[in-house]
Amino acid sequence: MTAAESIAASINQIDEKKQKLKKAFDDLQAHRSLLSPSFNLSWSEIDSHFSSLQSSLFNRLQSAVTSSNSGNIETPTAVTTETPVLWPELRKFCEKNDGKGLGNYMIENSRKRLSINEELPNAIRCSENPAALVLDAIEGSYHCSSPSSSSSARAIDVKRIFVLLLEALIEINANLTNDLRERARTIAYDWKPNIGNKPSEALGFLHLVAAFELGSLFSTEEICDYIFLISKYKQATTICKKIGLDRNRIGVLVQKFLDTGRLLVAIRFIYENEMVGEFEPVSILKTSLKNSREAAKRVCAEGNYSLKVQNEATDKELSALRAVIKVVKEKNIESEFMEEKLEECVKELEDQKAQRKRATKFNSPANPQQPQEQKVDNKRPRVANGSSMEYNLTIPPLRPLQQPPLLPTPSQILQVNPYGLLSSILPGVAVPYGNPRALFGSVPAPASRPVFYVQQTGYGMPPPQYRPPYYPQ
């Protein structure tokens, strides 16, 4: 086995290992009550991270194989033999023009679709009629997308595979005939009633319309409504261009995004359609920052400033803040955001989360050394007004609590009576426990009732912090 084949085999094992990781994550979630309140990582975030790594590794492997083979003039066919390292079955189905088999094979391996997607365009090119191959694959599996099964996991996988096939077809710019368009039109008319308010259905439908150039069969208003429905997907802007929406329609869409609070989606459409002159992206980004700040305050207030709610509000604001920072860096508009100090705001919010976590550990019941009066007086602080940073939305930094020593020093102890008053220790006056020096003996005198102590100031010592004595009720 060559080095490339060994690496490819390891990449293929990523999906299997992810399933084991998901099982461990589910087991961890079963004990969520024992986890820190700041632990809010979801499986979708973990899956997205490893899928991105898998795709990146595969691309680098293909680049390495291609570059090494391009330097060898005597073996020009090495590229074709080495490139489909991971999924040679794709090419077999395409060479046989077996669209139904291709669709079923991809659905069965839908959990590895990101890896498959890297090789799919080149595999489809091996078919005599790529457009017919894709239609055969869709028609052969379309029964899975019926309304009765639309909520099943398999139906969701089917829609994702349809999108991958249609994206690959758009990428290779395959030849289309009238017969193929008629077949696609029939599928589109059957598909449309199932869309409703389901973005995944709208995404597949729009890819079908774009791939087979069916935009003229539907009203522009319908197309815009469906694009608005799929606006969270990164393919939305590409679909707009492929279907052929004019600039005015896209401008109406952008305004609709702004009116409904989807400011970052509007920013994406503005930049990718080169509409900076019609809108003001810097102002929109600053409005997004303001909205995220106000939303965090509102969430904290509605949740009575509980620790969980504060962490959730901080996480949402951090997410919005990082999204703005990403756009600012990608578009090289850092100079417009000098006053906002975005990176410093991120650091402050992260510090607040860490500080709350430390305070939670210190005040937890597992800490047996915390005195009673501190637990009683340790009330939840409210939001600090007038803080130095704009993004200080939750609790202000907490000062670490100072614990008194477990055993007071002899010079700081005076005997008190059961009512909390100092007992008389004048010469010749009896005290309940005999000589006052007995207080400092190695064996304490027996007490007939509880005795309470108040810390006193020794000679030459600064006055201690006032702590009211505890009186039994």
Swiss-Prot record:
Residues 3-35, 306-361 form a coiled coil. It holds the Pfam family Frigida. One of its GO terms (biological process) is cell differentiation. Transmembrane segments: none annotated. InterPro entries: Frigida. Signal peptide: none annotated. Keywords: Coiled coil, Developmental protein, Differentiation, Flowering. Residues 356-384 are annotated as: Disordered. Residues 361-373 have a biased composition (Polar residues). Involved in flowering time regulation. Required for FRI-mediated up-regulation of FLC transcripts. Partially redundant with FRL1. In cv. Columbia and cv. Landsberg erecta, either FRL1 or FRL2, but not both, is functional and required for FRI-mediated up-regulation of FLC. Belongs to the Frigida family. This is FRIGIDA-like protein 2. It comes from Arabidopsis thaliana (Mouse-ear cress).
